[in-house]
Amino acid sequence: MDELKKLAGVTAAKYVKNGMIVGLGTGSTAYFFVEEIGRRVKEEGLQVVGVTTSNRTTEQARGLGIPLKSADDIDVIDVTVDGADEVDPDFNGIKGGGGALLMEKIVATPTKEYIWVVDESKLVETLGAFKLPVEVVRYGSERLFRVFKSKGYCPSFRETEGDRFITDMGNYIIDLDLKKIEDPKQLANELDHTVGVVEHGLFNGMVNKVIVAGKNGLDILEK
C-alpha cells in the first residue's frame, strides 16, 4: 500500500506548476506528495512557495529545501494536497486523525484547488465510523466533554503516551465516536456555534478532487 500511496502523492504533485503557492498537507499519503515536490525543487528547479499544515510538515519541507511562507503572509493558495480519514460520495470528509485539523482547515480555506490523496479504505457511504476530532481550548474542556457526553456523542480526550494530546496550537482534542453522521452539515454548524470549540474535523464540500490509491491502481474522483 505504501507504493500506491507514493504513486498517489506523485500524481498529485503533477498539478503543481512553476510560480504556484502550494499547501503542503500532513499524513502518511501527503508525506509522499511533499517528498515529490522537494525532489522537483532540487532536480527540476521547480519554483514554488509552500504553506504547511503542521510542525511535522514544516520540518519535512525545510529538510527538502522547499521555500516556505506563513499562512499570515498569503491571501490565496493555488493548490493544496492533503490526506483524509474518511470521504463520502458528496465529497464531505473527516480529517484530523493526525491532530493537525485546525492548521489544515486554515490552509484549505483560501485554496483554489483542494486535492485529497487517500487509499480506497477511506471511501465510505456515510461518515462517522472514524472518530470525529474536535479541537477545544483547555479552559472549560471538562465541561465541554460532559456536554458532548450528555448528547450521546461518546467523547474521549485524545492521549499520547498516557498524557493528553496537545495540538501544534496548544489545544486538546476530544474525539467523538458517533458511528454514523447522518447530516454532516448540521453537525458542523452545531460545533461551529459551540463555545470552547476551536475547530472540528468535518471538511464539508471543500475538496475539488480525490486521488484514490487502490489495489487496481489509481482512481481520480472529481466534483
Swiss-Prot record:
Transmembrane segments: none
Catalytic activity reported: aldehydo-D-ribose 5-phosphate = D-ribulose 5-phosphate
First-level EC class: isomerase
Enzyme nomenclature, EC number: 5.3.1.6
Functional pathway: Carbohydrate degradation; pentose phosphate pathway; D-ribose 5-phosphate from D-ribulose 5-phosphate (non-oxidative stage): step 1/1
GO biological process terms, semicolon-separated: pentose-phosphate shunt, non-oxidative branch
Sequence positions that bind substrate: 26-29, 82-85, 95-98, 122
Keyword set, alphabetical order: Isomerase
An example Gene Ontology molecular-function term: ribose-5-phosphate isomerase activity
Catalytic residue positions: 104
Keyword Transcription regulation tagged: no
Summary of the function given for this chain in its UniProt record: Catalyzes the reversible conversion of ribose-5-phosphate to ribulose 5-phosphate.
Record-stated family: Belongs to the ribose 5-phosphate isomerase family.
PANTHER family: RIBOSE-5-PHOSPHATE ISOMERASE 3, CHLOROPLASTIC-RELATED
Protein name, per record: Ribose-5-phosphate isomerase A
Organism, scientific name: Streptococcus agalactiae serotype V (strain ATCC BAA-611 / 2603 V/R)
Lineage: Bacteria, Bacillati, Bacillota, Bacilli, Lactobacillales
